[in-house]
Amino acid sequence: MPPVALGVLTEAILENTMNHDIELQQAVQAELGWEPSVVAAHIGVTANAGVVTLTGHVETYASKFAAETAARRVKGVKAVAEEIEVKLPYDIKRSDEDIAAAAIDRLAWDVCVPPDAIKVMVQDGRATLTGEVGWHYQQEAAEQDVRRLYGVIGVTNHVSIKPTVNVSNLSDDIAHALHRSWYFDPNTIAISADAGKVRLTGTARSPHEKQIAALTAWSAPGVTAVENDITLN
């Protein structure tokens, strides 16, 4: 190909990529504006080849989580780099002791969390959860309970999952569940499992489908970890 033609082609590709980035940026901004728990005016959005970066500040950790979730569900988003800062208003600041006490109370009232299974440590508004549960949904419920509390600016979930059932047919069980779903073609997702640890490979059409595949795997009895290596096509 002549140098001039190659240069024109390269310029066209770059222009197309730039236009896609602008469209994706605008789509994410629109989705943030559509999310009632997020003040979109406080969040900056940039996009580069499907990777979206969020900056700015919010007043609660729950809003920060909601902003990231909103960005992930936009078509064309491959990954989200989240750099949002939580700036608590003075009237909702809480001491670490108050946050820990509130977290313990919230967990105790949640029917999805086994009694006395979770321990909470809070330092400078950042909560760390430890303990052991039998299911992923219990692990997620505990984190959800704590991230919505006043004064929390971050949550680290170190709760482990201890399988309580035989996991010998784990790959087959997950494969059957995926194949029952209208989201997936049986030939697009591969599953491997070793003693409760599951790895997903293959392709999905969107981050949402990729997430659904992981949630489906987590629903299988005995799963302790899911490595989601599904790529987007």
Regions found by a protein language model. Give the residues of each.
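N-terminal targeting leaders
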Residues: 1-233
